[in-house]
């Protein structure tokens, strides 16, 4: 009989536990990375979607301002050129274009305010627009079929069920 395996039994269980913990950590890290990526992507493109929507609304007013139309066209052109990739070059390009988009959108809001000239309504500034965007992007919730069950789940459990 060979009793050498019995002497190494503790080491064997230690190694099995270590490998099991390592594999579980890899799964959890992947899940956290996926959640973070979804959140960042949602936050970035929420602002662009709101800009696009407000450009549609402003165009529907029919104000016929050449400056306004030119800036809206510029915003739409810049948005069409954005790539949805996640490599370093695309992210840097996105950040560069986002700065241009924000500045053009500020110009649109200022022009719109001058054209409307209604003193009774509060001015829509870009800061107000960004606050609305942050409020929307901060309310990220996953889709759940049964609301009662969702209230009892922690965010981690809900994310794992995605």
Swiss-Prot record:
Give the result of residue 57 to D, as annotated.
Answer: Lethal at 37 degrees Celsius
How changing residue 113 to L affects the protein?
Lethal at 37 degrees Celsius
Return the InterPro entries for the record: Essential_protein_Yae1_N, LTO1_adapter
The record's keywords, sorted A to Z, are: Nucleus
Alphabetical list of Pfam families matching this protein:
Yae1_N
| Outcome after substituting residue 19 to P | Lethal at 37 degrees Celsius
From the UniProt entry, list the residue stretches annotated as the region deca-GX3 motif. Answer: 17-53
Tell me the compartments it is located in.
Answer: Nucleus
Effect annotated for changing residue 18 to L:
Lethal at 37 degrees Celsius
Which superkingdom?
Answer: Eukaryota
Signal peptide (UniProt feature, chain positions): none
Q: Which GO terms describe its cellular component?
A: cytoplasm; nucleus; Yae1-Lto1 complex
Q: What is the effect of changing residue 83 to E?
A: Lethal at 37 degrees Celsius
Biological processes annotated in GO: protein maturation
**What's the subunit arrangement here?**
Forms a complex with YAE1; the complex bridges the interaction between the CIA complex and RLI1. Associates with the CIA complex (via its C-terminal tryptophan).
Further facts: Present with 784 molecules/cell in log phase SD medium.
Q: Which family does the UniProt entry place this protein in?
A: Belongs to the LTO1 family.
- Any idea what job this protein has? Essential for life in oxygen, but nonessential under anaerobic conditions. Required for biogenesis of the large ribosomal subunit and initiation of translation in oxygen. The complex LTO1:YAE1 functions as a target specific adapter that recruits apo-RLI1 to the cytosolic iron-sulfur protein assembly (CIA) complex machinery.
Supply the name of the protein: Protein LTO1
Species, as recorded: Saccharomyces cerevisiae (strain ATCC 204508 / S288c)
């Amino acid at each position: 009989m060979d009793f050498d395996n019995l002497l190494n039994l503790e080491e064997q269980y230690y190694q099995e536990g270590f490998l099991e913990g390592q594999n579980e950590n890899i799964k959890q890290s992947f899940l956290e990375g996926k959640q973070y990526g979804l959140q960042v992507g949602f936050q970035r493109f929420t602002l662009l979607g709101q800009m696009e929507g407000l450009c549609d609304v402003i165009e529907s007013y029919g104000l016929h301002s050449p400056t306004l139309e030119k800036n809206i066209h510029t915003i739409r052109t810049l948005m069409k050129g954005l790539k949805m990739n996640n490599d370093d070059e695309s992210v840097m390009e996105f950040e560069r274009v986002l700065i241009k988009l924000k500045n053009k959108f500020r110009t649109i809001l200022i022009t719109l305010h001058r054209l409307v000239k209604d003193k009774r309504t509060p001015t829509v500034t870009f800061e107000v627009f960004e606050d609305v965007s942050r409020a929307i992007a901060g309310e990220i919730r996953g889709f759940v079929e049964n609301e009662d069950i969702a209230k009892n789940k922690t965010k981690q459990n809900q994310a794992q069920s995605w």
